[in-house]
Amino acid sequence: MKHAEILASLFAAGHEVTVEGGRIHGQGPLKDGSMIQVLGVADDTPLGIDDAIWLAGQILADPTDRRPILMLIDSDSQRMARRDELLGLSEYLAHLAKAQFLAESEGRRTIGLLYGHTAAGAFIATALAAGTLVALPGARPEVMDLPSISRVTKLPLDTLQEMAKATPVFAPGLENLAQTGAVLTVWDPAKPLDGQLAELLAEPASGDQRDTLGKARGGRPKAADIAQRVFELAQADG
């Protein structure tokens, strides 16, 4: 689905969302009449420092705002230009992610919706930083592609390709990401999205459950147990 189709299905009665220069911003009415803030990246646009600080600013603009946030993502990776790197790209991306963490901690639901491509730091700082991540069929997320992993780890690409067949954490793609627990659910584009969004918002926020989801789905069998053990040891040490 394209962003125009998604917005039409989310807000059948109309919305105040605009898409300019790859940036999505505005708001739309939920089925109960309240409003949801809509932000994001469109058209496979790379996420640079100007975009990251602008998105964070939209989230932080009004400290009294309690609208939930929907982050629509169809991006390239982060913009790895000289200017962005020299000005501290990683800090800008971290600031955007932490803006969402803050919103979630203050009672604003943050929902990431993957509908196109996204990769690397752009993915981590936007949709993956949301409290809940959902997707539409055809989304193409990748934290790092296998050739890049090969360059970093010095492992042969053939070896990584074999590992990816059995270990979802090594493999890009929506199905693998869902197996690890990162994606809560994949929405059905044949049904109105406004109802699926309403159902999600009706569920109480349950904190970060990605490790337990990954264990249940077989994509990350150890993460939940290790996290629990670390927690128990920390408590024991006072």
PLM segments and residue spans:
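N-terminal short beta-loop-beta anion/metal-coordinating cradle
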Residues: 14-32
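STAS-typified acidic loop motif
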Residues: 26-52
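A structural preference for short, pocket-lining loop segments at secondary-structure junctions
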Residues: 34-40, 54-82
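Short strand->helix junction
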Residues: 44-45, 78, 117
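Short, solvent-exposed amphipathic alpha-helical segments in soluble enzyme
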Residues: 55-56, 128-130, 201-203
